[in-house]
Amino acid sequence: SVSKLVEITDAVPLDSSRVAVRFDDGYSGVLDMSAYLRDWPAYRKLRDPSFFATARAGLGTVIWGDGSIDVAPEVAREEATPLGA
């Protein structure tokens, strides 16, 4: 059977490196992007707190700015720590 890809239905920036995310399977968690900001040139723009604050749900994942920066929902699902943990 083909497993359904998880999608992000809600995303809210918490601070300058973390986003609260909700998935369509009911899971909610916090995605810490600090390692991405530090290690990945593609995410360098997110080091600007005002740009990071544009985080929102879109296209089934978390997007920033005009949508040209995103994070794969399956990666977010794997890395998000449960809310309240």
Residue ranges and their predicted role:
Residues 1-85:
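Motif-centric detector for short Cys/His coordination patterns
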